[in-house]
Amino acid sequence: MKNAPVDTQSDAATSFEGTAANPQWGGRFASGPAAIMGEINASIGFDKILWRQDIRGSLAHAAMLQKVGLLTETELAEIRQGLGDIAQEIGEGRFEFSPALEDIHMNIEARLSERIGEAGKRLHTARSRNDQVATDFRLWVRDAIDGLQEQTASLMRSLATRALEHAATPMPGFTHLQVAQPVTFGHHLLAYVEMLSRDRGRLRDARARLNECPLGSAALAGTSFPIDRRMTAAALDFDRPTANSLDAVSDRDFALEFLSALSLQAMHLSRLAEEIVMWASAPFGFITLSDAFTTGSSIMPQKRNPDAAELVRAKIGRIMGDFVGLLTVMKGLPLAYAKDTQEDKEPVFDATEAMTLSLAAMDGMIRDLKANTTRMRAVAGMGFSTATDLADWLVRELRVPFRTAHHVTGRLVGMAEQKGCDLADLSLEEMQSVEPQINAGVFDVLTVEASLASRTSEGGTAPANVKHQAESWLAKLGETA
């Protein structure tokens, strides 16, 4: 959630007045910041979410400092104990965050020094907040990706499970939102499994690229201390240290790539949500959503509103906005670090929360929805949906060129339209008046079920294909129906 607008006359704003400069960096300053400077500069209101990653990074850094001789074993033990106590304080809600200390890094470091004294002040040796925050942020995004991957897999399992259940359930396939050809409901659901699989691949790729450790890059140029960057990288489960200190502390392409992947995934969820909204409407009547994912109206007692689906549909605007916002922040920044980069976290936190909610809501809707199969079957045969099957029959059985078959079928559709009937209701004589070679075998391909059964090409909607694909996905995802 975005911070409320700052009231420069409020107690919060004036709380900075008269304070000394930040004790972590204020040695060369004679006085503290202006009230509004304190407000705009502080990020603790949102970056405190990084506390677990910050403590984990500090523990790895401290262990490395002790190994290379920059901390004693006693100091390391004190730091570990102090950071453990601070983690407990934060976890239990007892930690008092100070906006005057700006961010989560300074808040934890100041509290550590308060608890254990000199050893706490040694922790920041060979480290800058620049490489510290870059490390924390990569750890946080990596953790977020892992969580979203699990959620996405769960949604894919739900879709594949329902697809297997409805492998042979006819429904209309649309182009231009006009009935085009029959498909199965299972085939339609599996289309989203494929999309989500690619979304998982993009997140997996983003995770692989971000998995390098900035710690040890210091402010921008590295450090003169004899540190072991590979030790800290390994301790934090990174693949390797970053190769260039300037790049490590200044770029946020890993966050942008993450937001880009989320934007694409949100687009896919938005498409599915839109279809759920349509399918649940009275004119379609394809599905009924459970009470758990619908709401009522304050004035119209009969209403059953698909609010969960509508909110998922809308989240794309928020997530894509976060992506474009951060892209705009980063586009003109010279090397190396600039305070602009503080604006990197809120978009990522916001987009992650939006995606987490969207996946959970969509998973629940898919599991709980009821398919109105009779209605789906009725609409699947509307709009001359088997016309393509007729054209294919002319090509296959009578060796008519496809363009000629297309023309003949179009004339037969026009004839049926004029009579107000389906293609299958035309008599053989009427069909032969357009194409004399047509025989009674044509009627075998004009049913919805025959159309579905014939689509046996790889990736097609034949029920046997759909059943096989659904079972294959469930096996890949580690669950059988």
Swiss-Prot record:
The keyword Lyase applies. Residues 1-25 are annotated as: Disordered. GO terms for molecular function: argininosuccinate lyase activity. Keywords: Amino-acid biosynthesis, Arginine biosynthesis, Cytoplasm, Lyase. Its EC number is 4.3.2.1. GO terms for cellular component: cytosol. This is Argininosuccinate lyase. It comes from Gluconobacter oxydans (strain 621H).
